[in-house]
Swiss-Prot record:
This is GATOR2 complex protein MIOS. Zn(2+) 2 binds at C788, H835, H838. Zn(2+) 4 binds at C830, H832, C849, C854. The keyword Membrane applies. Keywords: Lysosome, Membrane, Metal-binding, Phosphoprotein, Repeat, WD repeat, Zinc, Zinc-finger. It comes from Pongo abelii (Sumatran orangutan). CDD domains: mRING-H2-C3H3C2_Mio. Zn(2+) 1 binds at C737, C740, C775, C778. Gene3D superfamilies: YVTN repeat-like/Quinoprotein amine dehydrogenase (2.130.10.10). A zinc finger (RING-type) spans 782-863. One of its GO terms (molecular function) is zinc ion binding. Zn(2+) 3 binds at C827, C830, C858. GO terms for cellular component: GATOR2 complex; lysosomal membrane. PANTHER family: GATOR COMPLEX PROTEIN MIOS (PTHR16453:SF9), WD40 DOMAIN-CONTAINING PROTEIN MIO FAMILY MEMBER (PTHR16453).
Length: 875
């Protein structure tokens, strides 16, 4: 403290009082002014607070440093260090009945007079007071006093003197300290280490020294210029800050050889550094002639593996006032609150507001932290926006094993919730593609199986100029219409559309029955009409009208259909054209559009966007010529690709066009889950290698990991390797011998190594299990488990490399090749480890390595070490 610039201190146990000290001591009381007016004589500190002067003490001249007594004292007991080296106990109260009244006025006098630079009360034994003095060649610079010691004249020389000529009260002058440290050196700063009552950290002239009062002849020290303002982080007692000129040094007492971090300030010298008592790792610094306080936030980082790893810090500056700041003091309990004082004793109450940290979890939970408060954004009861989010949908679908049904592929749309018609169309398309590919491969292997997955666009192009039309009779009507003769390619297209089953039979009856069972009577009637079976269409509509939930309008439509004659200029055609515009169901509309259209002109059916793509394509295959069909399919494909409509996969197949369509779909919805499963279903190798496909797959894998669906991600990887053998990953890790460097598991490979398979170490043909407790190459023993002290090794059961070719390998659940509990596991930092089961059991209750004398926090090195799979947790 300087005699010209004031310092400021909060009372440790009186959170509404603070002391300002320069040439005199002033005690202030802080009051809130939120709901009240400013009292007369009060000083405005901020918009919400004001200070009232309670008392002034001018009895201690030549003050150089002040320290508040750490124990509770309503009269605010203070220790004052003076320019002559004396330490005086004084108070700012007027209660003469205080329990500390016998201490007030007591002086602690060094042997030789010199300036007292710093004072520090012991936080564990509050009666111990350490004083740091300037250098004297024949005296110590660090003196530790006991303010309540009972001295006798035989032990400690004492004398009673008057404080001044006008005073009548006397006090004790104590001249014998408890401890004397730091001979022939100067002490510039002091602080007690909170972890031990008898450890004192001192900033000497050229070094930082840790004194142990149990053995004062020895000290631990490090040479440095940063010896001023030593202070201990209240939340991390091994972290200490000190400064010199414009640099702040951060020390770790566990590795005291050099600073773990050096903070370079402005060219101006520092005057004060202080840790925040309410916030972990927040350090405030002040430079001379500055109105800015710089804050350093020491971020929490994982335990460093390398010796040179520095902690992560966030730096920011705050400006509590416009004038230069002489000193500041953190409030002991209010979060991030401080009082600053200027050289002319103007004070300001200031709060450092925290940055708001947002956290958006993979399961769509939003939380943010501000100071000590943690807030969560919850969804309103009537708000279903979360259910519409694609991430939530993908997570629920993953729980239902969506996409993994490779036998009945169409069922995947049910696993997705059976709500999206595009997904339903997609999975039925993929189901038909798989079904007819297998059927074609059985009939003629390698012929047209791959064409199926290329989509209807490629199928139609392969048959250009090969189809002619012919006249066909209507069923239930004396009329004929032109229909294209169905060659093999058009039949395949109708099969992929789902209208007909596999085989040469083109009967749509089974398809109509399935539509009726699903309640899609309007669609069934339209399909029947497109197949020139007007009688069946009328029958379906009548049945729908007479059902429990039937629509009476279906009877009206059925009656209208029954009056169809095929005449171009009839009143019926005119009325149906008007009725068509009033119908809401798209299939009823296209029925009248078909009946009222001219031969070869079916735009009213083909371009009705509310009708399923597969029905429009099937209609086109029956009624359009090759040229018209190719032109229509090309145009429709481009529309589907641009819109990202999954129904278009029927046209594009799993080709490059399909990837383009899926890219538009992912851009529109973000559904990388469906994109991944779809592309894996039957795409050729060049399509699977497309970087867009790989991007979707890897992003979906990352999503599963982020959701902690590790088992689901493993299932996806297995599913992927089955459908795309080239994606099967190579072995990522193997255990090698420390002596010869060979893999210890080579003996279990499928090909024995020159007759040295592992079976030679046991009895030939013996069913007894052997253990790989030594290297198969050099026979050196493997490391021992840190807990059971048995050599690490995995029981081997029916090892493929050590059995005869005609023997079956037993890989049942009870006799697997390697059980997880017996697997090798070790820490990448300290290299200690053992059986996985033992390690898991140990680290359920411990964070430190089980090996004696090893202090490695093995489990804390991995940030996911304490996570558990979340696949059983319902959202």
């Amino acid at each position: 403290m300087s005699g010209t610039k004031p310092d400021i201190l909060w009372a440790p146990h009186q959170v509404d009082r603070f002391v300002v000290c320069d040439s005199e001591l002033s005690l202030y009381h802080v009051e809130s002014t939120v709901n009240s007016e400013l009292k007369a004589g009060s000083l405005r500190l901020s918009e919400d607070s004001a200070a009232t002067l309670l008392s002034i003490n001018s009895d201690t001249p030549y003050m150089k440093c002040v320290a508040c007594y750490l124990n509770y004292d309503p009269e605010c007991l203070l220790a004052v260090g003076q320019a002559n080296g004396r330490v005086v106990l004084t108070s700012l109260g007027q209660d003469h009945n205080s329990k500390f009244k016998d201490l007030i006025g007591k002086e602690f006098v060094p042997k030789h007079a010199r300036q007292c630079n710093t004072l520090a009360w012991n936080p564990l034994d509050n009666n111990w007071l350490a004083a740091g003095l300037d250098k004297h060649r024949a005296d110590f610079s660090v003196l530790i006093w006991d303010i309540c010691s009972k001295y006798t004249p035989d032990i400690v020389p004492m004398e009673k003197v008057k404080l001044s000529a006008g005073e009548t009260e006397t006090t004790l002058l104590v001249t014998k300290p408890l401890y004397e440290l730091g001979q022939n050196d100067a002490c510039l700063s002091l602080c007690w280490l909170p972890r031990d009552q008898k450890l004192l950290l001192a900033g000497m002239h050229r070094n930082l020294a840790i004194f142990d009062l149990r053995n004062t002849s020895q000290k631990m020290f490090v040479n440095t210029k940063a010896v001023q303002g030593v202070t201990v982080d209240p939340y991390f007692h091994d972290r200490v800050a000190s400064f010199y000129e414009g640099q702040v040094a951060i020390w770790d007492l566990r590795k005291f050889e050099k600073p773990v971090l050096t903070l370079t300030e402005q060219p101006k010298p520092l005057t004060k550094v202080a840790w925040c008592p309410t916030r972990t790792g927040l350090l405030a610094t002040l430079t001379r002639d500055s109105n800015i306080i710089r804050l350093y936030d020491m971020q929490h980082t994982p335990t460093p593996i390398g010796d040179e790893t520095e902690p992560t810090i966030i730096e920011r500056s705050v400006q509590p006032c416009d004038n230069y700041i002489a000193s500041f003091a953190w409030h002991p309990t209010s979060q991030n609150r401080m009082i600053v004082v200027t050289p002319n004793r103007t004070m300001s109450d200031f709060t450092v507001f925290e940055r708001i940290s947002l956290a958006w979890s993979p399961i769509t939970s939003l939380m943010w932290a501000c100071g000590r408060h943690l807030y969560e954004c919850t969804e309103e009861e009537n708000d279903n926006s979360l259910e519409k989010d694609i991430a939530t949908k993908m997570r629920l679908r993953a729980l239902s094993r969506y996409g993994l049904d490779t036998e009945q592929v169409w069922r995947n749309h049910i696993l997705a919730g059976n709500e999206d018609p595009q997904l339903k169309s997609l999975w039925y398309t993929l189901h038909f593609m798989k079904q007819y590919t297998e059927d074609m491969d059985q009939k003629s292997p390698g012929n047209k199986g791959s064409l199926v997955y290329a989509g209807i666009k490629s199928i139609v192009k392969s048959s250009l100029g090969m189809v002619e039309s012919s006249r066909h009779n209507w069923s239930g009507l004396d009329k004929q219409s032109d229909i294209q003769n169905l060659n093999e390619e058009r039949i395949l297209a109708l099969q992929l559309c789902g209208w007909i089953k596999k085989g040469t039979d083109v009967d749509v009856g089974p398809f109509l029955n399935s539509l009726v069972q699903e309640g899609e009577r309007e669609r069934a009637a339209a399909v029947a009409l497109f197949n020139l079976d007007i009688r069946r269409a009328i029958q379906i509509l009548n049945e729908g009208a007479s059902s429990e939930k039937g629509d009476l309008n279906l009877n009206v439509v059925a009656m209208a259909l029954s009056g169809y004659t095929g005449e171009k200029n009839s009143l019926w055609r005119e009325m149906c054209s008007t009725l068509r515009l009033q119908l809401n169901n798209p299939y009823l509309c296209v029925m009248f559009a078909f009946l009222t259209s001219e031969t070869g002109s079916y735009d009213g059916v083909l371009y009705e966007n509310k009708v399923a793509v597969r029905d429009r394509v099937a209609f086109a295959c029956k009624f359009l010529s090759d040229t018209q069909l190719n032109r229509y399919i090309e145009k429709l494909t481009n529309e589907m690709k641009e819109a990202g409509n999954l129904e278009g996969i029927l046209l594009t197949g799993l080709t490059k066009d399909g990837v383009d369509l899926m890219e538009s779909y992912v851009d529109r919805t973000g559904d990388v889950q469906t994109a991944s499963y779809c592309m894996l279903q039957g795409s050729p190798l060049d399509v699977l290698k497309d970087e867009r496909v790989q991007y979707w797959i890897e992003n979906y894998r990352n999503l599963l990991d982020a959701w902690r669906f590790w088992h689901k991600r493993a299932e996806f990887d297995i599913h992927r390797s089955k459908l795309d053998p080239s994606s099967k990953p190579l072995a990522q890790v193997f255990v090698s011998c420390n002596f010869c460097g060979k893999s210890i598991s080579y003996s279990c490979s499928a090909v024995p190594h020159q007759g040295r398979g592992f079976s030679q170490y046991g009895v030939s043909g013996s069913p007894t299990k052997s253990k790989v407790t030594s290297c198969p190459g050099c026979r050196k023993p493997l490391p021992r488990c840190a807990l059971c002290l048995i050599n690490t090794g995995t029981p081997v059961s029916s090892c493929p490399g050590g059995t005869k070719s005609d023997e079956k390998v037993d890989l049942s659940k009870d006799k697997k090749l390697a059980q997880f509990n017996n697997w090798f596991t070790w820490c990448h930092n300290c290299r200690h480890g053992g059986h996985a089961g033992h390690m898991l059991s140990w680290f359920r209750d411990h964070a430190e390595c089980p090996v004696s004398a090893c202090t490695c926090k093995c489990m804390q090195l991995d940030t996911t070490g304490n996570l558990v799979p979340a696949e059983t947790v319902q959202p």
